[in-house]
Amino acid sequence: MIQVIQLKGKDKHLYQLLAPLVMDPDVIRANNNYPFKTSEDFVWYIAIDNRDVIGFIPVEQKSGKKAVINNYYVAAVDEKRKEILSLLLSSVVTAFIPAGWTLNSVTLIQDKEIFEKFEFVSMDKKWTRYVKMYR
């Protein structure tokens, strides 16, 4: 059974859970060779299945109740990817939207439909691999 946990950006447990993934060359390559970052302004949503991290969404909290989803990762494809990403997004939306936050996301084009199911809308900004969305 997949469990989603929430950790603050400087939580020691976050580093223990994510280090094997964020230092893996395949995972870094999947992130367009961009390093994963965190700070005290981040909240991380981590999907765990049988003690294995199978995905995560970092959310950076900015001023004015604006939050940004960027550099998320899901270790699956097709239907399993949709399932994991949906669980993660559900946790993020449940935590932020009722509290009055605006969510912006730099979304992989392949995941656009999943974000739309959670009422994210595309903005005019679009790159080769990503689309900017908000809710």
PLM feature spans:
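Active-site rim helix/loop that mediates acceptor-substrate recognition in acyltransferases
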Residues: 23-48
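Conserved acetyl-CoA binding element of GNAT-fold acetyltransferases
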Residues: 65-77, 128
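Conserved acetyl-CoA-binding loop-helix of GNAT-fold acetyltransferases
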Residues: 80-94
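Active-site beta-strand termini and strand-to-loop segments that position acidic
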Residues: 48-50, 132-135
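Conserved GNAT acetyl-CoA-binding A-motif
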Residues: 95-108
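Conserved beta-strand in the GNAT
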Residues: 46, 51-61, 68
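Conserved active-site alpha-helix within GNAT-family acetyltransferase domains
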Residues: 108-127
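Short amphipathic alpha-helix that is part of the acyltransferase structural core
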Residues: 1-31
